[in-house]
Regions:
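Non-catalytic pre-domain segments flanking phosphatase-related domains
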Residues: 41-86, 101, 107-120
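Asp-based phosphoryl-transfer active-site loop
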Residues: 80-94, 295
Length: 350
């Protein structure tokens, strides 16, 4: 199980979760409860085995009870949509988001090649390795001040303008498979949270369609979403640039343009979720102020719903911070959302 092998590849962890559900296909009524879905599939849930990387407590019980109400209550499988933020919810986002590391390395290369960029942000921060500047920009953004975000965004858009979608995917995929987290000492693909990976498998085993709804780049996450999370690439919702198509002898080429299509954060999250799924999710999980509209949108008068807010409070195993989540934590208390404490609710982190 994921909780017993922190060094085990996450793809194997997710597969182990799914096998644990299949292993429950037996007849002992005390160990297992059979749930019939309104489809040709039947799933069995062994309550003693599920969410093994979660400690027994209010958060784990809330998840299991929500799934039980959804399935036993006959909510059609096609309505079982769950959405998850990525940075800080599914994988580690400190000391900086993983995609930020990817982009800063490219900006550093650009500043090396063109000295004129070294005095301009964000190339200046990348060249001087002033990652504190980036942290300040992100903190300002979550506090509602996007003045410096526009400066950062201009650099982000310039970093990969003009390259094909295939080339961008190859670069991001290679980065994620080779780069390591600066303080945790593990590869970035091993920075996904084992309890959340297990939760994704648990939901899928009970007929849910899981989606990523992230402020991070859609095309940055797509190459690894299936392998790491078991989420197909067509279920990845995220920020995006605009594209340009050019006809050629090789079937045509789509390239990134140096302009944003949309930033999938704040109010854009529910808009993009609706645009992609045509539904209000039954479950949403986030960790920051930018996730509040998505969590608000996951509300139903006549169906079960669950809002999860991941709280980073474990300096020993991960990080301890609330910056950028102050409003979300306040709303969680006011609205009865389920707070998931990394320190108290997770038996394992990675």
């Amino acid at each position: 199980m994921p909780g017993s092998g922190c060094g085990e590849p996450l793809a194997q962890q997710l597969w182990s979760v799914r096998l644990s559900h299949l292993a429950c296909l037996r007849t002992e009524p005390l160990a297992c409860e059979l749930w019939r879905l309104p489809s040709s599939f039947r799933y069995v849930e062994c309550v003693t085995n599920v969410l093994a990387t979660w400690n027994e407590g209010a958060a784990r019980r809330a998840v299991i009870e929500f799934v039980e109400r959804t399935v036993s209550g006959g909510v059609p499988a096609e309505e079982r949509v769950a959405v998850f933020d990525n940075d800080g919810t599914l994988w580690c986002e400190k000391p900086m988001p993983i995609q930020a590391d990817f982009i800063l390395r490219r900006l550093y290369e650009m500043a090396q090649a063109d000295p004129g960029l070294r005095g301009r942000q964000p190339w200046k921060a990348a060249y001087e390795r002033d990652y504190g500047w980036l942290g300040t920009v992100l903190a300002e953004h979550y506090a509602g001040n996007d003045t410096n975000v526009r400066t950062l965004l201009a650099g982000v858009l310039a970093a990969y303008a003009g390259i094909s979608v295939e080339e961008f995917e190859a670069k991001s995929d290679a980065f994620l498979r080779t780069a390591k987290h600066p303080t945790l000492g593990r590869g970035y693909l091993q920075c996904a949270y084992a309890p959340m990976v297990e939760l994704l498998g648990y939901l899928e085993a009970n007929g849910f369609a899981n989606y990523i709804a992230s402020g991070g780049g859609r095309d940055f996450m797509r190459p690894i979403s299936q392998e790491v999370y078991g989420i197909p690439r067509d279920r990845v919702i995220g920020s995006a640039t605009t594209f340009q198509y050019t006809s050629d002898d090789h079937g045509g080429t789509i390239t990134h343009k140096a302009e944003a299509d949309y930033l999938d954060d704040g109010p854009q999250k529910p808009i993009r979720i609706w645009s992609r799924t045509g539904r209000r999710p039954l479950l949403a999980a986030g960790n920051s102020n930018g996730d509040i509209p998505m969590l608000d949108f996951t509300q139903h008068p006549d169906k079960p719903s669950l809002r999860l807010l991941v709280l980073h409070d474990d300096s020993q195993r991960e990080f301890d911070y609330t910056s950028g989540a102050e409003q979300a934590l306040e709303r969680a208390g006011q609205s009865g959302w389920t707070i998931v404490s990394i320190k108290n609710d997770w038996a394992a982190v990675f």
